[in-house]
Amino acid sequence: MNKNLVIKSMAALAILTSVTGISAAVVEETQQIAKAEKHVTQVKDTNVFPYHGVVAFKDATGFVIGKNTIITNKHVSKDYKVGDRITAHPNGDKGNGGIYKIKSISDYPGNEDISVMNIEEQAVERGSNGFNFNDNVQAFKFAKDAKVDDKIKVIGYPLPAQNSFKQFESTGTIKRIKDNILNFDAYIEPGNSGSPVLNSNNEVIGVVYGGIGKVGSEYNGAVYFTPQIKDFIQKHIEQ
């Protein structure tokens, strides 16, 4: 092959690689700016509270509510069975908090989109603090109540595969509470299903079930934890 042609081809490849790298960096920076405008931030350290109370499914979120016990949605749990796995607070690292098998699944008997799962205490893959689930996470406490205009945050795994299982936090306010339904304006995306809705004290108010209308809607929905729902959850927390 002509030596000059080889040199030119290698130079062109180097330029293309450089341009591709720059383009990827620009896209990532643009995405981060867009998230910032929506009051969404990437969590840097998921080994501290409240972030290590959140767990990831392959395409959704859950959170810890007691010993070996997590909450998510029915529309999430329907795709899982006993023996399937969840990951505790990953942040681009699948083993950050350990990987655990599901031991049981209990769906709320009403129409509300809530499911309680009990988890095997010993990890399939250890977390940063060993093989014990409860050593690697911290359970959330229930909020006493909530009202319209309260500040809230949502922590979870939006678009988990696309975002390489990085954890994100979005902030907003409560717009409406009616019976078991809570509406809020914090930004969410697919993958946030099962995320905790937290008050300013990091106490859990409810569980995200989805957006209302288009993706990224500013009017989103969660199941509000009424006394009846709290009682159901409490009965399924492992003692």
UniProtKB/Swiss-Prot annotation:
<keyword id="KW-0964">Secreted</keyword>
<feature type="active site" description="Charge relay system">
    <location>
        <position position="75"/>
    </location>
</feature>
<keyword id="KW-0645">Protease</keyword>
<dbReference type="InterPro" id="IPR001254">
    <property type="entry name" value="Trypsin_dom"/>
</dbReference>
<keyword id="KW-0732">Signal</keyword>
<dbReference type="InterPro" id="IPR028301">
    <property type="entry name" value="V8_his_AS"/>
</dbReference>
<dbReference type="InterPro" id="IPR008256">
    <property type="entry name" value="Peptidase_S1B"/>
</dbReference>
<feature type="signal peptide">
    <location>
        <begin position="1"/>
        <end position="36"/>
    </location>
</feature>
<dbReference type="GO" id="GO:0005576">
    <property type="term" value="C:extracellular region"/>
</dbReference>
<dbReference type="InterPro" id="IPR009003">
    <property type="entry name" value="Peptidase_S1_PA"/>
</dbReference>
<comment type="similarity">
    <text>Belongs to the peptidase S1B family.</text>
</comment>
<protein>
    <recommendedName>
        <fullName>Serine protease SplC</fullName>
        <ecNumber>3.4.21.-</ecNumber>
    </recommendedName>
</protein>
<dbReference type="GO" id="GO:0006508">
    <property type="term" value="P:proteolysis"/>
</dbReference>
<dbReference type="Pfam" id="PF00089">
    <property type="entry name" value="Trypsin"/>
</dbReference>
<dbReference type="InterPro" id="IPR043504">
    <property type="entry name" value="Peptidase_S1_PA_chymotrypsin"/>
</dbReference>
<dbReference type="InterPro" id="IPR008353">
    <property type="entry name" value="Peptidase_S1B_tx"/>
</dbReference>
<keyword id="KW-0378">Hydrolase</keyword>
<feature type="active site" description="Charge relay system">
    <location>
        <position position="193"/>
    </location>
</feature>
<dbReference type="GO" id="GO:0004252">
    <property type="term" value="F:serine-type endopeptidase activity"/>
</dbReference>
<keyword id="KW-0720">Serine protease</keyword>
<feature type="active site" description="Charge relay system">
    <location>
        <position position="113"/>
    </location>
</feature>
